[in-house]
Amino acid sequence: MQIYLGITICLVAFLTVIDCAIPYYRTHSNFGSLGRRKVRQVQRDLTYRWPNNTVPYYVGNVTSTIKKSVRLAIEELQAWTCIRFQNVNEKYSDGDSVRIVDLGSCSSPIGRQQIGTQDVSLTKNCWGMGTAIHELMHAIGIEHTQSRSDRNRYLDILAQNIDNRDLPNFELLSPRLWANLVPYDYGSVMHYSADSFSNKDDEQTMLPKDRSFIETMGSMIPNFYDFDQINQYYQCYDSCRNAGQLANCANGGIPNPNNCQVCNCPMGYGGDLCDQRPEGCGSTLVATDRWQKQKLSVRFSRNDDQYFTFCNSWIVGPSDRTLQVIYEITSDSIRRQICSFGCYEGGIEVKHLQDPRITNDRDCCLNTPLNLTTTVNPLPVILYTSGATVTYDFSYRYV
């Protein structure tokens, strides 16, 4: 048995979430080698928003690695939203501010607390940019996805696998106090993993109603709806309503509030108008009425330290036809290496669902072929990794 470090979320105090660093274990089961990672919603009370969409912050006693995680997270949030992080010094006294500090946990209050300086804590076990974005999203007012008032439509909670002291972490938010601005997304960076707070090794505490999403929950990849709800909550899209030229976005894209002539694009789509395959590795595969086979791979780039390398491919066919794909990972040893709740070491996402914005079911564990039929065309196929070279055998055709 290999032992790794992961994070858990412990709800403490008022509107504060702590992600406590603890060990987790990768073990074998009939589902595969599943990692154990203990680790959105917005308040209707707008006083928790940061004035002028600006968060003053300064960095305290953290390592250079954490500083890089914070820098990358801020760059990502500022690229997708109108939120601005203003770097100030520790003597800042013109209002509320955020201090990035290591308090031995991954934690943040929810929204602006109006107490002067509030802490966002990141420690060495808070993994990369994904966790930094998670905590900064808490700081600007975003709660956990699985706490939404409509959660029970999407999850089954297995209370028998949760200690009584941990059950408050699964309480629902009041719809009177908290608003759901976007659809429920299992792949949100704000969603718990399937085994969060489990009191038994290799036992789930929550199961998606659609079981194919069990590996998707617990993602370290911020998705389209994560940024979209920030933009709605902070009314970022208002800047584009009066714009002279507005991008005509395809495939579910929305004009970027920082530049209304280009689009924020869902994963798997790129270009200024979301009508192109994203730049970088990957290829466009043209389907015929006969099965074709192709190996699709992603190799980690050291330039993507603290995050992931992505390769985006498209499968295209005639507009009036349905696409069929069959895929499976080529190496069982790599499968065992990357298999985890959250697929945070690598995996694949085939965007076959009709909503191009939502996270589809990701795979990093199954050792049998997956078979999909979809009218989505072109069909995005996203491979990603945080280290290992991941390769899938792909068969495809149209019918």
From Swiss-Prot:
Cofactor note: Binds 1 zinc ion per subunit.
Gene Ontology biological-process annotations: molting cycle, collagen and cuticulin-based cuticle; proteolysis
Tissue-specific expression: Expressed in pharyngeal muscles, pharyngeal-intestinal valve, rectal gland cells and arcade cells.
PROSITE patterns hit by this protein: ASTACIN, EGF_1, EGF_2, ZINC_PROTEASE
Residue positions the entry lists as glycosylated: N52, N61, N371
A GO MF term: zinc ion binding
Coiled-coil ranges per UniProt: none
Location(s), subcellular: Secreted
Binding annotation for Zn(2+): H134, H138, H144
Disulphide-bonded residues: C82-C236, C106-C126, C240-C260, C265-C274
Function, as annotated: Metalloprotease.
PANTHER family: DISCOIDIN, CUB, EGF, LAMININ , AND ZINC METALLOPROTEASE DOMAIN CONTAINING (PTHR10127), ZINC METALLOPROTEINASE NAS-25 (PTHR10127:SF826)
Name of this protein: Zinc metalloproteinase nas-25
Taxonomic source organism: Caenorhabditis elegans
